[in-house]
From Swiss-Prot:
Family the entry assigns: Belongs to the IFT172 family.
Protein name, UniProt field: Intraflagellar transport protein osm-1
GO terms, biological process: cilium assembly; dauer entry; intraciliary transport; non-motile cilium assembly
Phenotype of null mutants: Worms display defects in ciliary structure resulting in defects in ability and osmotic avoidance behavior.
Localisation per UniProt entry: Cell projection, Cilium
Oligomer status and interactors: Component of the IFT complex B composed of at least che-2, che-13, dyf-1, dyf-3, dyf-6, dyf-11, dyf-13, ift-20, ift-74, ift-81, ifta-2, osm-1, osm-5 and osm-6.
Taxonomy of the source species: Eukaryota, Metazoa, Ecdysozoa, Nematoda, Chromadorea
Ranges occupied by WD repeats: 14-53, 63-103, 110-150, 151-189, 191-229, 233-273, 511-553
UniProt superkingdom: Eukaryota
InterPro entries in the record: TPR-like_helical_dom_sf (IPR011990), TPR_IF140/IFT172/WDR19 (IPR056168), TPR_IFT80_172_dom (IPR056157), WD40/YVTN_repeat-like_dom_sf (IPR015943), WD40_repeat_dom_sf (IPR036322), WD40_rpt (IPR001680)
Tissue expression per record: Expressed in amphid and phasmid chemosensory neurons, where it appears to concentrate at the base of the transition zones, which correspond to the basal bodies of motile and sensory cilia. Moves in the retrograde direction along cilia and dendrites, suggesting that it is retrieved from the distal endings of the cilia by a retrograde transport pathway that moves it along cilia and then dendrites, back to the neuronal cell body.
Role summary: Component of the intraflagellar transport (IFT) complex B required for transport of proteins in the motile cilium. May be required for ciliary entrance and transport of specific ciliary cargo proteins such as che-3 which are related to motility. Required for the maintenance and formation of chemosensory cilia that detect chemosensory cues.
Amino acid sequence: MKLKYLSTILPAQDGEAKISNISCSPNGSRAAIACSDRSVALLDENGVQKDRFTCKPIDAKYGKKSFTVLCMTFSPDSSRIAIGQSDNVLFIYKVGTSWNEKKVIVNKFVQPSAVTCLSWPFDDKILVGQLDGKVRIGLIKTNKCSSLYKTDETVVSIQTHPKRTSFVSAHQDGSIILYNFSSRTQSKICTLQVPPYNLVFTNHGLVVATSDRRVLSYTENGVVQQQFDYNDQSEKEFSSISCDPTAQNVVVASYDRLRLFSWSARRGAWDEGAPLEIQNAYTIGALGWKMDGSTIYAGTVCGGVFSVDCCLRRGMLKSRFETTYVAPSHVILRDVTNDTRTNVISNKGLAIDELKIMGKDRYVIGYTSSSIIIADTESQRFSELEWQSGGHEKFYFDFNNCCLIINAGEVTVVEYGVDGSLGWVRTELTSPHLLSVQVSGPDVEEHKKVKKLAYLVDPTTISIINLINGQQESFINHTGAVDWIELNERASKLLYRDKRSKVTLVDISSDQRSVLLSFCTYVQWVPMSDVIVAQSGDNLSIWYNPDLPEQVTNMKIKGEVEAVLRDADRTEVIVQEPTAKVAYELDNTQIEFGAALEKRDFDRAVAFLESNTSGTDAYSMWIRVAEMALEHGNLFVAQRCYAAINDVAKVRKLHDILEIADEASISIGGDGTHFYKVRAMLAIMGRKFKEAERIFLEQNDTESAIGMYTSLHKWDEALELAKVLNYPEYEQLKTSYLRALSDTGQDSKAAELKVSDGDTLSAIQLYIKSNKPLSALSAANNDSVLSQDENILRQIADSLVKSQLYDKAGDVYEKLKDFDKAVEYFKKGDAYGKAIQLARFAFPEKVVTLEQEWGLHLEYIGQYDAAVNHFVEANDLKKAVEAAIRAKEWPKALSIVENIQDQKVRTGYYGEIADHYSNKGDFERAERLFVEAGLFNDAIMMYGKNNKWIDAFRLSEEFHGREATISSYLAKAEDLDEHGRFAEAEQLYITIGMPHKAIQMYDRVGRDDDVLRLVERYHGEHMHETRKRFATQYEERGDLKAAEEQFLKAGDFRSAVNMYKDSEMWSDAYRIAKTEGGENMEKQVLFMWAKSIGGDAAVKLLNKHGMLMEGIDFACETGAFDLAFDLARIGAKDRMGTVHVRLATQLEEEGRLEDASKHYVEGNKPELAVEMFIRDNDWADAERVAKDHCESLLPDVYTGQARRAIEEGDHLRAETFLLRANKPDIILRYFIENEMWPDALRIAQNYLPHQAALIQEEYEKSELRNGARGVDSFVAQAKEWEQQGDWRKAVSALLKINRDSTDNDALIKHSTEKAADLVMKFLMGDEEYIGAALGALDEANCNEKAAELLLLFGQSRQAINALCRAKQWAKAKQVAQEYLPEMVPEIEKIYKESLKSEGRLGELIDVDVITAIDMMIENDQWDKALDTAKSQNYRPLLDKYVAQYAAILVHRNDLSRVLAVLERYGASANPANFSIYKLLMEETLAKPRFDYTEIARVRNVHLDVYNALQKESSEHFEEFSRALWALHLIAMRTALEEIGDSVPEVQKLCLKQSLSLLRYTDILVADRIFYEAGAAAKDYGSEYESLGFLLLNHYLDLVDAIEEGNGELVDYSPFENSDIPTEVSLPTRQWLESAKHEEMKEWVLASSVDDAHAKELVYDKRGVFEASLKDKRGTAEPCLVTGYPVIESTVRIGSMVAEKDNLNKFLVVIKSNQTENLLNVQNFVAKWAGSPLAISL
């Protein structure tokens, strides 16, 4: 954008005359300038001053100069100006939309301090900033002002976000506060060092120009984005700022300079443009940017105002519209014909790439990268919506205030002036006649706006969508296809016409449809009215009031209606008559009435009604004007309207309201209609009582609200309101209500009030008094006391009887146990159901009678279907059947009849029911009933009557005999035939099996179609024959079309073609040939057609079908050369030669060579003539023609003569002719082929010297082939014999190549194999050559080839041996499997021996894995052997070799390696390996200190064995289970001991594990286990110290027994109540070292004299050792953590258990002291149990 000085608007004055504010109207048509003399100058859109008015002070007594104008802004609708003044007031002036309107104050807001700044974001709300720091909001309608928030600093600026979602206020202390409209919250977002007087709010945040010569950019959150500092430049302080309408550009003004900043979407930042300097401007204090973005107005301190042009570039469209780009996203379009301007702006800030003018040059379409902008140049409104244009969209501009975009079956509605789409629908019917949309203009009040779309969902269904809420308002289904629809202007009615030209009017709100006109050729709403004009024939129909569609005005016209035109004075229908266009004028007065109401011109509407008082609908029209006038606050007009219809009450009421309004206007200003009492009274008049109540309550006028209801006798609403508001006189109000009810005789209403007060007894009396016994009964039932009061209930019952509510009286008497009266009144009230229900237990004998009476009652009232069941209950089946029949309940009637015992009665009913089913068409059921009733003839007649002859025949045959039936039906058929009832006769003929009679009948009367139909159905084999017969008949009669049809249907299209050919109807013949006969047939007929007409006509015909060339060829092929010459001469002269050649060819075939040669020459093909004479050996004529016409063929003539000489053996003459023909190469080739080598060399040397060397070489090769050169000769000879097919000589020659003739082994092998191939192919029947070849192959060591030959010779065994010698094992095995299966093992054995001897293990594995593994083991390649065994996926094989290797490693005492092997390959459950596992366990546990890693490895191996044994259910499972438990407990204890005793839980857990290990002393080192358990118990102390003594004492006994070698010395009696083994094998040596042993021995001895030790096991509540699993009840499961028995607090972990407390302790220990070994234990337990460990709660 560039800034350019444009012009001076107001000249500067000599002294100070500051322009305080410049404001531009949102519609771009005006600009207001606040001058120093307290006046406001108004400029038009061209910057010319058109008006000026002076501002007023808050009070005239202060004088006209008692204030200054501080701020000013336009309203959103541009019709008002708000002016803030220093004398604490805000005035709103109405300036209107035209220049001649008077400027009046419409709102006055008195403020507590001076108004410093303004912003007007919404029509009804204005933001006010004040000197005292308050930010207030003014409500325009109520003329009230309230504070939004308050600060202590003056408000220096207020700016609203472009999208009106929030605003910011700037204050004297530099703070900026953001207020959000939706959340109604404010927050301080930043604070500047200087007051932010110059502030704008853009789409990209805040821009502030400060007095310290800086321009700052902030985000909405107060974060600094950019800073432009001009302190280092010759710049003065910034004095004003303005933002363009797109909020993409900002201009900042200083002393004499304007600086431009533009937002860069690409950079996301502000870019500074070139500044504009204005000399002598002297401080620009005010800026205003026109809404079209083209001009900036700048005001100075000296009172001068000038304009600045803002433009990027300019251009022209259609030589009429000037485009001015004020920004990439803002274009001004100026129509140079009338100087109107239109803004095209992208509110998204996108660059406008393309502009198009559409819709009769009224509408502008702007395209951006991702949106589309549509602008109306007349209304100056534009809209932008997101759109990805593919260039295929269509635009419909036929509708007011909106545009339709059609794209890919979607209809998008765009309202001018509103961004985004108004709505969209999907339909394939997108013609503008099938779409109608009505969108109200911006001048319509919000609550009256209409936005509706009518469209076709399918050709017969109309949908009407409310575009405001997106809901479907109406869905209209029509019987036929609709071809035109249109909504009226208010979208309250819809007109549509269907394709049968019927016009229908639909009232959308009531869905009422009225057919207005049939055979309609034109229909239209009169513009800007609800009048309908339609034409049908020469009749023009007008509906002036569509609400009364029956009131139609008709006039005769003499043409077709073209259009309906309307202006201010008249409305005319333009009719195109035969001679000219004629205008028929409509009653414009009636139309104007509706238009006046639409425009709210009530005075004009009243004037119309006053001049038309005699109309039939005048009353409704006065009412309509009155209601609309009231709605728009025009009370005088409303009063006049009500007076016209003599509604005195409303006239008086309006008079009172007007008096109140006049009084209010004095106090609050305006016309007083905004006064709350006026608004409330108007709401009361409109019966909007809740609205009036709300208005009163908003003003805290409770008395008036309640008084309104009481005056209207709406006591309930008054009481409800009083109760909600806690009205102090509520009780008095209620008393007044009761008194009023009593005075007016409203006892029932009083009773309701009594009920609500809880006085039920009084309420009941009042209900009875008001003759409302049901309400009394309801009140009594709701009172637990009164519902049991017999007197009250009898009073109510009597009242019910008086009111003839007998059924309710019966209920009361039933409650009183007076069953007789209850039943009596139930019957009187026809409540038979209740009577029967009561009688079932009170009077059972009356139930049947009551059922009968109930049935009779239902029958009496016509409820026959209900009566049926009651007659059945009363066992009156006849009445039941009759009721069912009268109710037309035929199935029910039939079921009842079947239960009647009297056959005679039943038969009568069957007939009646059968008649029903017969009439209904249920013939099968009717037949059954007729037969059941014995009415056979009725059944037969039924079928005959309904032309069901087959069924009639069947029944007749069944009941009257076949012969009689056939005779009767044949006669009937013939009779029908004679009377022309052929269809019925046909059915009868077919029914009796005589279809030929029907065929003959139809053939006789000439109904060929029926003949064909019956022949096809019953004699299909004669169908083609019949059709051909008919075709011949038609042909004879001259009906060739019918004949053609039958020929074609018979598949004989050739006959049809011949028929037309014979009749010379060539076009028809050609048509059939083309469609039925294929391409060849088509051509034949066409050529025959052409031949028949000849000449130019034939050429034209063939050219028409593009067949001229093919026609010439066809003529030639058929010998019609005269026709061919004619066609070529006339239409294709270039084909004349071809015709001559074709004729010459035919003449040659006929032997007429001389004539043929002439035509060859005329056809420019003399060479063909020469060739013809050569073929005929006529050398003279051939030489003559060649010399005359084609000398190039003379060599061919001579060559032919030479060939003849060669054939005769005259070589010399042949040589002469060939040399004359200059073809020495031919005679050379002849001499070579005949091996005449000297002659060949002579010719080559004399005439072809370049070939002499080659001939010499060939001469030498010939000698070689003849055996002159040894082995090479043999090879050459063999090759030559092979080429000649002399296989024996070829083989003999090849076999001569052997060690006797050469030392070249490769040549010998190749020659021998070649000889064998020849023998196999050609000499397999010659044993001599087979033997010779085999001998040679054996000598040459060609075993594979020998095997092939032997196999062909039938020597399978020798062939297999040969393959083995060739080491072709696979082939040998394959051959053996096919021919000698018994040799397969022998071959495999030889193969294995070969592989083994050659050491080829890889191949041996594939053949014999066991042998291969054994070889690896022999080579000590155990890892490779085990990997190979593992790869076989056969576990026993792997286990075998693992066991072998483990045994070897054990023998080597390499136990670590044994563990590694078992871990890698798995431990098997083979008992042979058990000793190894036992050894591993013993050796690992025999070490002085337990190593967790080693124990864990042994434990893991045992787990593998454990799992395998468990799967096999092995007898060794228990043995390994005990070993695994022992290893597990030792491993877990070892892992825990690493933590130490610092954790209290660890010591107890280790103790329990040690005690649990005692049960495994028979498989562990006994002395060690007892020692460790005793030491743990001793160290733990407390109750376990005695146990420690007992166990350590036993340990000493074991040591003594070990030393003595006598296990009987050990006493196991202390362990009787435990599972500690008593038979334990003694170790060979003591485990503990002597020092510790002596120490422990001393402690035991010292403790033995202490009586404190009980010297016994620790027992639990079971009475056994606490670590023992076994007790009297059985064996408990061990705990996974301690090994203790789990008796209670069981936690199930997979397949195992744990005691909850010990499990939790263990897991807590792991969590608080994570070690690698503890985690390993946890993982092992989870794997063993099959479930992870988790803390149990």
